[in-house]
Amino acid sequence: MSPREVTGEAAGEIRQLVPDIETLARRLADVDYLVDEGLATSIFLSLRLPQPLLLEGEAGVGKTEAGKALALVLDTPLIRLQCYDGIDAAEALYEWNYPRQLLSIRLADSRGATLGEEELFGPDYLIRRPLLRALEHPGPRPAVLLVDEIDRADDDFEAFLLELLGEAAVTIPEIGTIRATHPPIIVLTSNRTRDLHDAVKRRCLYHWIAYPTPEREVEIVRRRVKGSSDTLAVQVANAVSRMRDSDVQKPPGIAESIDWLAALSLLGVERLDAAAVDLTLGSVLKYGEDQEVIRAAGLEQLVRGGD
């Protein structure tokens, strides 16, 4: 049996909740996360094999939301680790509660006793960070562990994750190896700002999330911005698609499409026009240079393309 395998009652509950790919896609849609067949298949296999799932794609295409939606579908906690340059075990896994250790030493001294290393470096003195909390989650269903933007971390941190990814375990030098009773469902995301190590990829299922078609994007943004004009949603999706095909440095993701539609709807816009685009361009393009590219190409042209 794989050390990552979910067994017993938890496995049965997961199989009952998502018996097949179609049911998984429908349940994800119920929490307003729309997937195509490829992504639904990857998530399903990740649950059943089980194996960590590595999602790569441009910023804003919905990688992080996949982990959040999966936790909602499985009705289990989401434990999120946001990666950054320089992150290490103290932030990700654990650190020792030195003030508590010192207090215990002083208390023991006042009683004429001495605390040994095994007593001071035991589970009671651990400050549990996201990775350890996910491993020690008591169930009944495994937690969803979202390791977000792993490409922001360095090679050493990737190496540190290998034991967790491959064996659902971590080793703490003073304690030993801690193995998960309910191995977490692991979703890693990357914006591909750098290549991840092959050792990480070998331990994961891989899926690239591309930008959705304008038709799919209309469905997504309408679900996320309740009460918005149908016509406006179509125009926004098509206009954003044209922006992605232009020479902008940072193409807008789905998150920006949602923000833009929300801003336009708040202003009472029902149909997109050049004036509305000009006023709200900062909701969808976050670099001045990119805004100038779109303005130079003509806002009227952008709007006509969005009809």
Model region roles, listed by residue range:
Residues 1-307:
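C-terminal regulatory/interaction module of P-loop NTP-utilizing enzymes
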